[in-house]
Structures are given as C-alpha cells and as structure tokens.
Amino acid sequence: MNRYRLTVEFDGRNFMGWQRQKHGATIQGSIEEAGASIAGQPTPVQAAGRTDAGVHGLAMTAHIDVARDFTPFRLMEALNARLKPRPIAILSCEQVDPEWHARFSCIGRRYLYRIINRRPPLTLEAGRAWHVIKPLDAETMDIAAKRLIGLHDFTTFRSVHCQSKSPVKTLDHLDVRRIGDQIEITAAARSFLHHQVRSMVGCLVLVGQGQWTADDMTTALEARNRAALGFNAPPDGLYFTQAIY
C-alpha cells in the first residue's frame, strides 16, 4: 500500500464538512470517491483536522492510501480531474512513509477567521466571511484575545457535542488585526476543541462592539460553563490554514 500526503484547498459552502457522512456531500467522501475511481478499489483518506459544514480550507493536510503505484504528480492530476466541478483542489502531492499519519503525526494546527466589517452587503465575499455591520474595535479585541492564550480549561468555548476526552488545551496564539474593512483573527494550537475557534471569535466580536470587556472574557473562561458563552460565530469566515509536523 502506498501512502501519499496531500495539500487540499476547498470551499466548504456546499459541503456537510470534512468527515464522511451517510447523507450529504463531504470533502473526505469526495476525495475518496475520486481516488477509488482511479485505483479501482477503496482509497482511505485521513486529514489533520475535521472541519464543520461551511468551513473552508486553504491548505488542509491529508493522506490517501492507494494500492496501485502512481507518481505523485500523476495522482494529483488524476484526483483533480475527477474532483471537478466540485470546489476541491489538490495543491500538492508527495509519497510518504506508510507510518506517517496526517492526523496523528500533526503537532500543530492553525486557523484564520475573516470578518468583513462594513455596512454594505457582501457580494464577492458572501459565504466566505462573516459580515458584521456594527463597527468593531480590533485593538480591544486583540487585548481580550490575549486573555485566552495558554493552558486553560476551555469548557465555555467547547461544543456540547465535542468528543474530546478533556476540555483542557494550550492555546499558543490568538491574534486580531484590522486590514481596511477586514478583521483577521488567527489561532494556533496543537489541537482545538469542537467549535472552540468559532466560540472564541463570537465572544471577541462582543468585545469589539463594546458589549463585553477583556475582564468579561476572563470571566467567561473561568466559568468553565457553556452557558457563559456569548455566542458562536458562523462557519462562513473560518479557514483551516496550516498543519504543522
């Protein structure tokens, strides 16, 4: 069995998320179907992260197992041909050791959350960013974001459906910056809880709108209670940007 490392870009708007589902289109399912049509047998795919419905990928790392021999370039070209017209692209492909695993070998993950902060409706960015009309103070948001960095119990920022054994995670990086009418929030950690990034972003927007202070963010964190959460940001603005090995 040959294992290939893939870098995958995708527009998550019309998918049920990364993970294969019994009903509905998914990124994993689409790539496995494309691989099976090339190899003539199942081609299991695993990824560094499992994104939700509507979440996008700029550079998701995955691996695919193929029994037949392909050069990486030929496999990449064949997968891309069969993935059309779905908004999924294999950006790179390389053969790796069969023991290497896209998920379990990963030591860090990075996400980007994009907010368009303006009154006019979104056109080109619709479904690819969160449209927030009320003005946001990015500097205040960044100050509050720093309250979350470090080793914490993130129960408040964890989905009730999260399957992680422990709510304790180390958040290595959380940064907020404004570029024109766009606000970019970047987050990095070894791993994240289900909905953790979107939950943190939702609370940061409350801070940016003046409804919360940085102290309120700390209070929510220390509550270790989902009821203390402001709200979840929508999936539209979330992008998986990098897996670190």
From Swiss-Prot:
Keyword Ribosomal protein: no
EC number annotated for this UniProt entry: 5.4.99.12
Residues the entry annotates as binding substrate: 111
CDD domains listed in its UniProt record: PseudoU_synth_EcTruA
Class in the EC hierarchy, top level: isomerase
Keyword Oxidoreductase: no
Gene Ontology biological process: tRNA pseudouridine synthesis
Catalytic activity, reaction form: uridine(38/39/40) in tRNA = pseudouridine(38/39/40) in tRNA
Catalytic site: 52
Keywords: Isomerase, tRNA processing
GO molecular function: RNA binding; tRNA pseudouridine(38-40) synthase activity
Stated family: Belongs to the tRNA pseudouridine synthase TruA family.
PANTHER family given in the database record: PSEUDOURIDYLATE SYNTHASE, TRNA PSEUDOURIDINE SYNTHASE-LIKE 1
Quaternary structure annotation from Swiss-Prot or TrEMBL: Homodimer.
HAMAP family in the cross-refs: TruA
Chain's role: Formation of pseudouridine at positions 38, 39 and 40 in the anticodon stem and loop of transfer RNAs.
Name of the protein: tRNA pseudouridine synthase A
Organism name: Zymomonas mobilis subsp. mobilis (strain ATCC 31821 / ZM4 / CP4)
Lineage: Bacteria, Pseudomonadati, Pseudomonadota, Alphaproteobacteria, Sphingomonadales
